[in-house]
Every structure is written in structure tokens, then in C-alpha cells.
Amino acid sequence: MLRAALSGSSYVGVFATATDEYLLVRPDIEESLQSEFETELDVTAVPTTIAGSGTVGSLAVGNENGLLVTERVTDRERDRLETETGLPVVELPGNINAAGNVVLANNEGAFVHPDLSRDALSAIEEALSVPVERGRIADVQTVGTAAVVTDDGVLSHPKTTDEKLDFLEELFGVYADIGTINYGGPLVGSGLVANNTGYIAGEETTGPELGRIEDALGFIQ
């Protein structure tokens, strides 16, 4: 467990995203903090921009099969991401293209913004090689901000219904529960970076919130 801030913000999920193979993080992260992130998640960090922005957690999402990024990514950024991760990088087309905000995915499934086009769904399937379903979480369309998923669990918006939790468990093949981040924040995807090894929560996250995170994501057996 690590509590941290990036560029003075507790919303670490806006600025970073992780799988069990890599961590993408904004390029101005301090070396000491980068080392702490790498140790907690047991991965190598790739400091980068996407579309010239440090909000890489909002603009990218991936799993063991590939990486999905906004179509505004530059050729140089895309080439570097492919080189550093060793994975294919696919662009999310259309006006709704902040991939990390609108796609929630692990190695079993993807749950995405309800208004994504068929072309966008095809791009997601191509990048991540998993079944894709559209919908909302607690009436939030940007599902990547409303939840966090690993191959061990889902932590979701506190107003997620039991029916939706059951749906998420079926889609992702893991246990799902509700929680908050950063002293009551409902958009847990914006304040949490996690993989199967560990997690980084916003520095304002409370002890009880950490307990919910650890239970939902399988760190407490």
C-alpha cells in the first residue's frame, strides 16, 4: 500500500495507469516517487505524455494483450509506448476518446461508455482481446473514473447497485464491492492505481477506505 500525490493532486488515477507488466505515469514524476511506485506495483515505470498531456491515466488503459489510447496520441508517443511495453498500441476513435476515462478493463472483459460507436468497440476489442459491454456505473458514463478493476477484484462507486456489482463480477470474473477514495470521493478510478501486486491511493485516502480497497481488490484473503 502506498498513499501519494502526483503534481500536488491526490487524484493519482488521472496521471497514472498500471497493469502487471508496466506503469504509465506523467513525465514530471520525481525519481524517488517513481521508485516507490515501481516497488509497490512490482513493475517498471514508463514516464510519458499522451497527446502532449500528463493525464495519462485518463487517456490510456491496457491489459496483458495491448494498450488502448486516445486517437490524439502522437506518432512519437505511440512508438515509445510500443517499445517500452512490448505491446501493440491501438487508438480509440471518435469524439469520446479519453480511453482511461471511458474504458474499464482487465484480462477477462471490458466495460465501456454507453455512447461509444461500433468503430470504437472494434478498436477496444482489437486492443484488449476481451469481450466488451457498454453501460453506466451509478449513472456515471465515464466508467473508468467510477471503478478500478484488476484480475483479483473490482472497487466501484459507492452508489453502485447490487445488480450492477453482480454484472461486473460476471464480466470481469472477480469479486466486486463498493468504496470511496480521498476522504469520501466517489470516483474511485480517479484516485487509485492498482494491479494484482499492490496499489497506490491518493494521499487523502483514509484508513477505513484503505480497508475497503484491500478487501475489494483481494489484498485481504
Curated annotation (Swiss-Prot):
Per its UniProt record, what InterPro entries does this chain match? eIF6
Q: What domain of life?
A: Archaea
Key word Protease present in the record?
Answer: no
Instruction: Please list the GO terms describing molecular function.
Output: ribosome binding; translation initiation factor activity
Q: Pfam families under this entry? A: eIF-6
User: Does rRNA processing show up as a keyword for this record?
Assistant: no
Which SMART domains does this one have? eIF6 (SM00654)
Keyword terms of this UniProt record: Initiation factor, Protein biosynthesis
The Gene Ontology biological process annotation of the record reads: cytosolic ribosome assembly
PANTHER family from the xrefs?
Answer: TRANSLATION INITIATION FACTOR 6
Q: What is this protein's function?
A: Binds to the 50S ribosomal subunit and prevents its association with the 30S ribosomal subunit to form the 70S initiation complex.
Family of the protein in this entry: Belongs to the eIF-6 family.
Q: Could you tell me what this protein is called?
A: Translation initiation factor 6
Q: What organism does the record attribute this protein to?
A: Natronomonas pharaonis (strain ATCC 35678 / DSM 2160 / CIP 103997 / JCM 8858 / NBRC 14720 / NCIMB 2260 / Gabara)
